[in-house]
Amino acid sequence: MNASFWNYPSKQKSWPIDEEMESLGEVIHPLDNIGGFDVRPGFYQMNGAYQTEEGVSFTVSSHGATSCVLLLFRPAAQEPYARIRIPESYKIGNTYSILVFGLKAEDFEYAYQMDGPADQARGLLFNRKHTLLDPYAKAVTGQRNWGEKPEGGKDFVYKARVVQSDFDWGRYRNLNYKFEDLVIYEMHVRGFTKDASSGVKGGGTFEGLRQKIPYLKDLGINAVELMPIFEFDEMESARVVDGVQLYNYWGYNTVSFFAPNTSYAFHQEHNHEGDELKRLIRELKENGIEVILDVVFNHTAEGNENGPCFCFKGIDNNIYYMLTPDGYYYNFSGCGNVLNCNHPVVRRFITDCLRHWAVEYRVDGFRFDLASILGRDQNGAPMENPPILEALAFDSILGDMKLIAEAWDAGGLYQVGSFPSWNRWAEWNGRYRDDMRSFLKGDSGVAGRAITRITGSSDMYDPASRGYSASVNFLTCHDGFTLYDLYSYNEKHNEKNGWNNTDGDNNGMSWNCGVEGETDDPAVMGLRRRLVKNAFAALLCSRGPAMFFAGDEFCNTQYGNNNAYCQDNIISWLDWNRLEEFQEIHDFARFMIHFRAKHPILRRDTKPAVCGLPSVSIHNGEPNRNYTDYNTHLIGIMYAGRNADDTDDDMIFYGMNAYWEPLEMRLPSLPESYHWKLVVNTFCEYQDGVDFEAQTQGDQTRVRVPERSTVILLAEHDL
């Protein structure tokens, strides 16, 4: 067999095989002519389409197909100008590969048609009339502008483009922050800047987000977690409710896993479709901010048996999806189908996809939506050691990627604290969210659990193995109330979603502080502001990585909607006018993020303090009452260790009073020559650049904590 079958193309205009052949005085020649196109077998180990000196190599695999036709389209055309049936002799194993001479990437788009058996009971859905998207497509055409009907209307087909890989990353370097040092800022690319109040050009795009990097850097976060940015169909299930157009806004319905979402690009660059995203990632990292992608490998946009067939269904339906014995789709995702993640073919596909984003886009990690689905076998049963999770944990390219699991699924599997990890996987700690929400709003009987969560959830994450670096602590995310709404609404208000308020979580553990929704009552608003500050103080004094939702730092609201997946409007968009209205909250959040950065003991163990104090100690709050008592609402935690540059001991006391009356707390004793200084009191209004009543404590044995407030004290040397 000719050597060219097995060589990889480089990312330049020529392939290594070209150079090798030229050095031998040989060139690659066509072997056949099909429909006027010179062709030869392509590059079998390079899935997808790649430009070469001679033309373009196309490679696609199917276990069940009996034939494969390559379709070539002029840009934006709906009908192909060429159909090239790939010869059976060009098929090795289950892989079709063909090199078409003379093609230039900018001149065409492509798709496939496959024939084979059609038997739904066996999960076989081959139909030679279906136009199929390349699973490895690096760019997808057809939905260029957000919310517009696809090109071609009801006859629309997805097509792929060949993308040039020549982006200049400059002096690129990995930031490689420790997991527990992360402060993660979860955001929706469109919603972050789409509202005119953002003040950027190209709002709702990667470019719009890029213009907000100075804001993010000043805030102090060191990682962004981008909600789905793979090509998705916002028009899926689009509908009008009360005169308002609703979309599949969040994007958890992937169309193409290797391609960035077309409508998120402000600059549409043919054959360089990913460059705007790459510029964003490059500048984020130049400013000290890692990039984590929210990825959806639990289901696809093809839906169930009533859904469209544009990719996996027509290529190998019974391999890519989990099917019941009678050929229907399991639905552990709640979205119509489930990817068969532990089938060897799908396992390789997922690994290849993540490698692509790690290499081509230089991302730093991935958050896996409904990750417990990746732990199910091909019949849907949970596995003790799922092959796909193990493969990703030990993959050589993904070796320094951050892997974060949403450790549950819609089928009832809940694995927070027990997700298979190989000491590589972290988890969204849903129990942190629930226990801390309960304590912060004043519930009884949860103080002990709150202390466990703040100090690293050792009941779930064994300090001898993963420890608290595996616990991604959060109080809010895209799914649920915003932080402001958590203290403004007792009940969800999802009526505008069109489901009679039946969708969304019914147990958000929220409290409206006495008035449902917006109010001008100064007492209510003062309490809400204080509770938001308490939440930031607790989150940023908790051991392990921290995460919050974009806009929480200036009290962005979704008006009580806790499931805004379909709202492409001010309900989901950030209202940057609130930054001025809630400047104090922003400044407090910024202060706490920077305070956490200056004091490593707040987020992880450091070298032991020379003075001999333990890394973490728990202190009684009310005299003669232990924090484990059912009715206590007062907790105190002291952290001790070495400071950031290992030049001195560092000691911090965190105290929280969730009770509705002021309470006194006993302060732990300090070593000789140290005294306590009050640096945070959430009862007081914060002024940027001025510590919260920063002063030496007159009484070094106790501190008065106002009702529903937090205090933080820092040990200082005596003068």
What is the predicted function of each stretch?
Residues H188-E207, Q211-V363, L370-F394, L413, ...:
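Substrate-binding/active-site clefts of carbohydrate-active enzymes
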Residues D107, D119-G123, T193-D195, F232-E236, ...:
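Short catalytic/ligand-binding loop motif for oxyanion handling, primarily in non-cytosolic enzymes
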Residues A137-V140, R362, G375-N379, E384-A550, ...:
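Conserved alpha/beta catalytic core and glycan-binding cleft of carbohydrate-active enzymes
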Residues V183-Y185, V224, V291-L293, F366, ...:
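Hydrophobic faces of well-ordered beta-strands that scaffold small-molecule active sites
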Residues N2-Y185, R190, Q211, L216, ...:
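Carbohydrate-interacting/catalytic domains
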Residues T66, N222-V224, D364, P545-A546:
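Short acidic/polar active-site loop segments enriched in Thr and Asp
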Residues G208-Q211, V224-E225, H272-R279, V291, ...:
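Generic recognition of stable, solvent-exposed alpha-helical segments in well-folded globular domains
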Residues Y110, M114-R171, E234-T254, A259, ...:
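Core domains of carbohydrate- and sulfate-ester-processing enzymes
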